Amino acid sequence: MLLVTMALAPTGAVPGSSTAADATPRLPKPEDRYALAGGCYGVQALSTAAYLVRDGDGFIAGSQSLDAAEPVHFQATDLGTYLLYGTAKDFVAADEGVIGSIVTAVKNSQAGQIVGGVTTGTTDEAIDAVRDGLGPATGLGGAIVAGGTASELADWEIDQVAVDTFTIKLPALEKFLTVGDGGALTLADEAGSSGQFGFQLTDGCAAFPEVEVGVEGPIAAGDTAFEEVQGYIDAHVHMMAFEFIGGRVRCGRPWHAYGVTHALVDCADHEPGGHGAVLEAVLSGGNPVEGHPTDGWPTFSYWPKYNSLTHEQLYYKWLERAWRGGLRMFTNLLVDNHALCSIYPLKRNSCNEMDGVRLQAKRIHELERYIDAQSGGPGEGWFRIVTDPFQARSVINEGKLAVILGIEVSIVLDCGVTLDIPKCTEAQIDERLDEVYGLGVRQMELVNKFDNALSGVTGDGGSTGVVTNFGNFTETGSWLKMETCAPEEGEAQDNTQMNLHDDAGTPEAITGRDGLAAGILEATGLSGVVPLYPAGPHCNVRALSPLGAHMIRRMIQKGIIFDPDHMSARARTQAMDIIRDEQAPGVVSSHSWADITIYPRVLEAGGVVTPYAGGSKGFFETWAAYKKFADPRFTFGFGYGSDVNGFGSQGGPRSDAAENPVTYPFTGFGGTTIHQQRSGERVYDINVDGVAHYGLYPDWIEDLRLQGGDAIVADMLRGAEAYLQMWERTIGIASDACRSDVADLTDAAVGSLDTGMTPEQVIETIGQPHTRHDAAFTFCMTGARTATATFDDGGHLVAVAIA
């Protein structure tokens, strides 16, 4: 790996930068509309050469001097669209008029938001229709004002029409900003000459509110796009979960077009004082009578918190901190739960789980665009959605984050089951699998919380198992069919279902209580009356169905990585038998929802295991145990599955942190200096707060290093590489010929390489290299020889040397 400096946060302000967020000096005039992002400019009306200045409660084009101009911070809301943020921390905006102000007040009120949730947004649509109909007659767009809050009336689209010449359009009203008599700013249907503007670099802008990253130093990147990578992997993340379960369960979101002040706010139904937050109390072990503080940005007195499970923990700047700290790959699992969505009274989205998958896939591409917009244009952002291992390797070697899409739902591909009758066919599975592949999905689980037409589920233990069993009944018409496992099944077991007389205060660590399932129990107020089960250990009779076996084989054919987590023990065993028989390496156990018999089989197949992150002490112990399962034929790398935003608690503070604390600042991956993370007025400390939000994962890894030394960190830095090599084999690339069970390459095979081939073409032709250093690959050949393929600066094969 070569350390290069890329877009670092300097200690002082860069001229023309509102917040010292960018290190590359800006040109006096932006080269295109994307270059405006994060910059500080004077806005000049080219028809009069006058700059925008303040005038009463608005702005006019009123001065020929840049020194007198209002310094405007351009805050990107999407590619080419901006909030124009003034020195008084206000916005250049169109007046919303009398009706518009009433509509805004109604929709933003607690009552308005709750009614909107209960009616799935139909009341909001009706109110908007009234505003759109009556707005123009009551002042909507009648003036350009200094708006107090960001809104669609302050969200401007910038287009370049000539060199140094731009138009400013308000998409909400489909009108252009123009300059009239006396420099008055008006809206017009056409831009014309009076609607042409230029932007001149200046300083003095107000700082737009934002979460701090708190990481300094170089970003580790590769010397070439195709060499071996280093970096951490999280194979189980739910970044788009703000849209799941109807879209009203989680409070906050990973980004908002209008910034952190809109993204990190509590839910309206948590007011007043958190007393309405029943689900939060259930999931996080609180008391709805006592409530909780609801302040979000900038004080965060209660949330984010490692065990506050209805509040956002994966804001994009927190993810940026994790990326700067060494995260180079993660799988965002598109997630939903029909049962809980049907029960929860507030919603804005469909409860169909596959509708949720489609919506969240759309949203994550919107986030990619948003980060691109902050970074200077299309493709410039550090957050890159990838669909094959070659693309992912290139992204990581560029020093960016490779994002894989996956699915974790109970009724995957709409393949539910009712009274043992499946609701899908093999043909429908094929068609729907093609659809999600087209969405970019490359990693999938077959089940989540309930049996479906593909597989039985492992179930939950303890009191939570009672409610998930009830949920299974409501979703499938059948209780979980558990029986005592046969002795020969050994440790291949499901979670033991308790009978009613078993509920005698068994610790949650034994009952296996799960936040999502507990939410269903408390939200319904039902304990259920489940069957009387025989003695444990329990095994779900429902194993892998013929439809499930068909789907796994189709996933293998399409190169989709299979995750056995949440399947019943017998289904997992049968699934891994298929993986073995098909010699399919595309398997990952992403977050510890399998059993101890499965993890060695995953690694033996050439797959990857990324256990549930949780507390650093427990994770260290898991690493020490699982490392013994490593198969020497494959690169061993270790990752984690955070399950963040998926109703899974993050790691709390280590109990003995006071005796052996993480000390700040510390040196992270690639020589970075990692300080305590600051979000508004709140400063976080891993020793006190645990993993309160995703930005504290670099701190968590440092905590691991304190316990396990450099060895555990080294294995985790190989996590992304191990996954990439597994992914290559998943899509049909032949294994490394240096393996003892793989035939060495012949002269004829190596001779089939042609000058000018790309690294991808070389690998597709003769298989995985044994080493990938800088611009050269090595391969094992017959006769104990080594072939070295060398590439030029453009990434094309120039020579193959055999020695």
Put a short name on every predicted segment:
Residues 38, 227-230, 234, 774, ...:
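Extracytoplasmic
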Residues 89-105, 154, 744-755, 761-763, ...:
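Long, charged/polar, surface-exposed segments that mediate recognition or autoinhibition
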Residues 31-42, 223-227, 750-755:
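N-terminal helix-cap/turn-to-beta initiation motif at the start of protein domains
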